[in-house]
């Protein structure tokens, strides 16, 4: 009998060991529980797009190839945020040369544009007049020419299939459709895609984009030239002008993406942060971090309610000082912002501002010395990529407000931006009585100020430490800053760094907005220090980040928009 029990026990042990062995060693298609990938990772704001980026890397593509393929997908699955009718910035790091560069494919004002062309914000937010010259495809082209490995057409194929066959409406698109349903229903060309039986689509409903699939096919075969000086150009111009716009064929013919080989760079301890300069918000992010690094934040800075409350008060005060200086920025090709940028990226200047932060109280907005105001921007999508060889791409793309100008071509399927709304107008003074910023007034060929700041952080060993960026209009810069602070200084893992409830203050309005779920000790500490507190109506920003860990690349796509990363 004892022998029988012994044999049964041995058999049971063997079975357990076999099961454990199978779990540990057999190949699995399931996603890693913690999204840590040994070789490469893609974090987009839609899972299918992360997977398309991952598959591109697996097929031998570069980080840039993966970014382009994933962005083409995001332009479908989160069409309310970005697409080929918009523009983007890419921050690219080459692990072989150990050099970072920026590709600027932001939209520009048409040649017929003028500083006084808008008498109301409605004109700049919706309709053909709000459309700036798109740059997205020229940006892809330049990035691919410099860093592509796979054929250009290969990058379009997964999204052509997706647009043709259809895909379920995701969390982010569903929320945007619900929020914008009145505008969608007002525009038959939008309702053609995003409505069913007179109502906007809901999460899980199937959406197809056959006309945009055809346009993707044309671009795949004919290249970017088809958009700017080829078979698509006349129809693009016709669509915009019939909606009241002023974009011409000459505007499209003359558009070029710009290579910037000297990105804005600041030191974060033994690491270097690379980000775009003006007219993007790299200088704003630099000033925030330079002010705060003087406090030597660490995990101990958030260990007790008292410490955490003081720490977040200091963070908000840094936001306020940085946004006051943001109003001086503009397109450096048209306005001289050299001294402004030099100050905003200077540790000495940051030290002076830090000395003005009181640990016991906030101050009226005039204390921070805003000289002008700049309009809020909105929308956007961000993705982060790290490839097998350690190269990285941080890309932020936008059509500005949800569904851009609301002008969608019923021929090409392209949804056009309303980027002209990102300029300041001399005819529109904001509700706080602060004058609009002349540095951001409209001039033909000029790019408007933007909150976008795609970031790559590199260690002194030349290896990427973090790839991060955000979407969410004026909340982009603060959301990106918080993700960096959470990860690098507080020691949070990347998922917590991205998911931690956020707060935002852009000085005007003089309000500190808090996300639901934020630590009540923080809210109480801010109230004690006389901050005017307001609960966020939805959420603050959407962040995608990848961080190097001893186990591999830890990736996080923000659940606020329903994204999920992929890798291998």
Curated annotation (Swiss-Prot):
Superkingdom in the source lineage: Eukaryota
Post-translational modification: N-glycosylated on both chains.
This protein's record includes keyword Ion transport: no
Record topology, Cytoplasmic segments: 1-4
GO cellular component labels: plasma membrane
Tissue: Highly expressed in kidney. Detected at lower levels in liver, lung, plexus choroideus and brain capillary endothelial cells.
EC number(s) per entry: 3.4.19.13, 2.3.2.2, 3.4.19.14
SUPFAM superfamilies found in the cross-reference section: N-terminal nucleophile aminohydrolases (Ntn hydrolases)
InterPro entries, A to Z: GGT_CS, GGT_lsub_C, GGT_peptidase, GGT_ssub, Ntn_hydrolases_N
Membrane-spanning residues: 5-26
Location, primary (coarse class): membrane
Pfam families: G_glu_transpept
Record-annotated active site: 380
Ion transport in keyword set: no
Catalytic activity: an N-terminal (5-L-glutamyl)-[peptide] + an alpha-amino acid = 5-L-glutamyl amino acid + an N-terminal L-alpha-aminoacyl-[peptide]; glutathione + H2O = L-cysteinylglycine + L-glutamate; an S-substituted glutathione + H2O = an S-substituted L-cysteinylglycine + L-glutamate; leukotriene C4 + H2O = leukotriene D4 + L-glutamate
Disulphide connectivity of cysteines: 49-73, 191-195
GO BP annotations, alphabetical order: glutamate metabolic process; glutathione biosynthetic process; glutathione catabolic process; peptide modification; regulation of immune system process; regulation of inflammatory response; zymogen activation
Sorted UniProt keywords: Acyltransferase, Cell membrane, Disulfide bond, Glutathione biosynthesis, Glycoprotein, Hydrolase, Membrane, Protease, Signal-anchor, Transferase, Transmembrane, Transmembrane helix, Zymogen
Extracellular side: 27-568
Family to which this protein belongs: Belongs to the gamma-glutamyltransferase family.
Quaternary structure (record): Heterodimer composed of the light and heavy chains. The active site is located in the light chain.
PANTHER family recorded: GAMMA GLUTAMYL TRANSPEPTIDASE, GLUTATHIONE HYDROLASE 1 PROENZYME-RELATED
Protein name stated in the entry: Glutathione hydrolase 1 proenzyme
Organism annotation: Sus scrofa (Pig)
Gene name, Swiss-Prot/TrEMBL: GGT1
């Amino acid at each position: 009998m004892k022998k029988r029990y012994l044999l049964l026990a041995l058999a049971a042990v063997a079975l357990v060991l076999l099961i454990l062995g199978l779990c540990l060693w057999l190949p699995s298609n399931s996603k890693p529980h913690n999204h840590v990938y040994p070789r490469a990772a893609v974090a987009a704001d839609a899972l299918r797009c992360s997977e398309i980026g991952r598959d591109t890397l697996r097929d031998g593509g570069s980080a840039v190839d993966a970014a382009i393929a994933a962005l083409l997908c995001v332009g479908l699955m989160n069409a309310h945020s970005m697409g080929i009718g918009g523009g983007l910035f890419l921050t690219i790091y080459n692990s072989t040369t150990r050099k970072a560069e920026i590709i600027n494919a932001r939209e520009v004002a048409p040649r017929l544009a003028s500083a006084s062309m808008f008498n109301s914000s409605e004109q700049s937010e919706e309709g053909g007049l709000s459309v700036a010259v798109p740059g997205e495809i020229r940006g892809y082209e330049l990035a691919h020419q410099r860093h592509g490995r796979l054929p250009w057409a290969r990058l379009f194929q997964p999204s052509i299939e997706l647009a043709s066959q259809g895909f379920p409406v995701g969390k982010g698109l569903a929320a945007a459709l619900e929020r914008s349903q009145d505008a969608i229903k007002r525009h038959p060309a939008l309702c053609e895609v995003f409505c069913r039986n007179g109502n906007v689509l809901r999460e899980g409903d199937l959406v197809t984009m056959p006309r945009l699939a055809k346009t993707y096919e044309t671009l795949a075969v004919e290249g970017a030239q088809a958009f700017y000086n080829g078979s698509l150009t006349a129809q693009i111009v016709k669509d915009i002008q019939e909606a009241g716009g002023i974009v011409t064929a000459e505007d499209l013919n003359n558009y070029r993406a710009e290579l910037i080989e000297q990105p804005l760079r600041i030191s974060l301890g033994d690491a270097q942060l690379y980000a775009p300069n003006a007219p993007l918000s790299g200088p704003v992010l630099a000033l925030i971090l330079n002010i705060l690094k003087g406090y030597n934040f660490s995990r101990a800075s958030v260990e007790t309610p008292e410490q955490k409350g003081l720490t977040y008060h200091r963070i908000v005060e840094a936001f306020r000082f940085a946004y006051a200086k943001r109003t001086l920025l503009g397109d450096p090709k048209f306005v001289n912002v050299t001294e402004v940028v030099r100050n905003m990226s200077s540790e000495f200047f940051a030290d002076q501002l830090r000395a003005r932060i009181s640990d016991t109280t906030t101050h009226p907005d005039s204390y921070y010395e805003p000289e002008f105001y700049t309009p809020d921007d909105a929308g956007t999508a961000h993705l982060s990529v790290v490839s097998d060889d350690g190269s990285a791409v941080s890309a932020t793309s936008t059509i500005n407000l949800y569904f851009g100008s609301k002008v969608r071509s019923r021929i090409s399927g392209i949804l056009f931006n309303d980027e002209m709304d990102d300029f300041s107008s001399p005819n529109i003074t904001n509700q706080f009585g602060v004058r609009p910023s002349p540095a951001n007034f409209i001039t033909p060929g000029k790019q408007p100020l933007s909150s976008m700041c795609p970031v790559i952080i590199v260690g002194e060993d030349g290896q990427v430490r973090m790839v991060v960026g955000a979407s969410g209009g004026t909340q982009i810069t603060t959301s990106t800053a918080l993700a960096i602070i959470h990860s690098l200084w507080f020691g949070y893992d990347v998922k917590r760094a991205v998911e931690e409830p956020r707060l935002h203050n852009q000085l005007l309005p003089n309000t500190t907005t808090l996300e639901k779920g934020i630590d009540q000790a923080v809210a109480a500490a801010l109230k004690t220090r006389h901050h005017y507190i307001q609960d966020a109506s939805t959420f603050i920003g959407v962040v995608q980040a990848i961080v190097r860990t001893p186990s591999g690349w830890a990736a996080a796509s923000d659940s606020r928009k329903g994204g999920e990363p992929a890798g291998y």
